[in-house]
Amino acid sequence: MKSFIINLSKISTSANTASNLKKQLEEFKMPVELFEGTYGNDAVEMMEKENRTWHPFGIKGPDVIPDPAARPNLKGNTPGVKGCFYSHFRLWQKCVELNEPIIIWEDDIVLTRPYIPIEWTDVLILALGHPAKTEKYRHYLENPMGIPKAKPYFQSSMPGCCGYALKPHAAKKLIDTYHNTFLPADNAINQHHVIIEIHSHVMGIALIKKDGKKSLTRTSYWNKL
């Protein structure tokens, strides 16, 4: 299964972490490519040209998340979030174009083990991200037990999008859902639209959780250029 690492090559920190992740995946004999992400300021311009608006509902259902135009300081209404969404959206398109499952990585991941092939339905979490949403699954990384398989994931949306596998039919669902709208990428992938599962032998962990480093959308990576 092909892997794609979202990488912002004009930002040295992103380029370095992406290069390190690529080396880890190559050591595991996994096909991997660097994928140039969408910079935040570019995403803002693209959304204006496309008249792309905030999706009418989020992880808790219709009319729960307000339109960011009415709240300029809303967390989701930032160049970083928009650039991140576009980067993932373009890889959903790549998945459909290839017509095969792919793995999508953000660059700030440290891996523990290679991918162990299993069956899953739509979306499969492969790396631990948001601490509050993944703490109960920590043993899948540190002390996995039993036969590797897809396990239920009980949160409404992704715990960040630092590492996940995606099937073409699920990618198409997401593309159709957000063809002219957007949400933060992790909220966009939610169980109103796709089934989210987690690998019982998780591959890695985001640096935000391992070393206390900030995630991509909380740094200037996405909107610096």
What is each model feature region?
Residues 1-105, 109-225:
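An acidic/histidine-cluster motif and surrounding catalytic segment
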